[in-house]
Regions:
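Extracellular or lumenal secretory-pathway regions
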Residues: 1-101, 107, 120-121, 152-166
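Structural motif
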Residues: 103-104, 115
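Gly/Pro-enriched, hydrophobic low-complexity segments
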Residues: 112-165
Length: 166
């Protein structure tokens, strides 16, 4: 498979959960689908084939910092489940001076990097001092609220935030 080829995943809700030592990025669409499916099965079994937009197209889960100093990527391809654990690789960002805009009422600044074969642009806010973001994008002096690759095959937009319950 060519990860640089054009594949349209469509729009999908993803979620980034940030803890003190670990962050978790996943498809919220897929998680909601699976939770509803499990509730409806009530002990029965079912076989699912083909693509269903309601269940989400992204099957990956990504943990940064688990285990410590590493990242863990979980995915499913053609029914086979995979787990890849590797050392953390931090993108080498160039912060673009005099580039600002507002996202969700936060002042954001632009940064760029080449990472995993793509040129990425990210907008981060120093108002939320977490060096985190979607997928494997992190390492800026604030939370990434928008990121996209130069071909705009992947676009991550933060549409809301909430504080988790303790």
């Amino acid at each position: 498979l060519d990860s640089m080829s054009r594949y349209n995943y469509g729009n999908e809700d993803t979620q980034l959960e940030v803890g003190e030592k670990v962050s978790y990025f996943y498809s919220a669409t897929r998680r909601a689908y699976m939770e509803n499916l499990l509730k409806s099965l009530d002990g029965r079994s079912v076989q699912i084939q083909g693509s269903n937009p309601a269940r989400g197209n992204l099957s990956m889960d990504f943990y940064r910092g688990y285990p410590t100093g590493k990242s863990t990527y979980l995915d499913e391809v053609l029914g086979e489940k995979f787990r890849i654990t590797e050392p953390l690789e931090q993108p080498k960002w160039d912060i673009i001076a005099d580039s600002t805009k507002q996202i969700l009422n936060y002042d954001c600044q632009m940064a760029r990097c080449t990472f995993k074969g793509r040129i990425w642009t990210a907008w981060f806010t120093a108002d939320i001092p977490l060096d985190n973001g979607p997928w494997k994008l992190y390492g800026l002096p604030g939370l990434i609220l928008r990121a996209y690759d130069s071909k705009q095959q992947y676009i991550f937009d933060c549409v809301g935030m909430k504080q988790a319950k303790e």
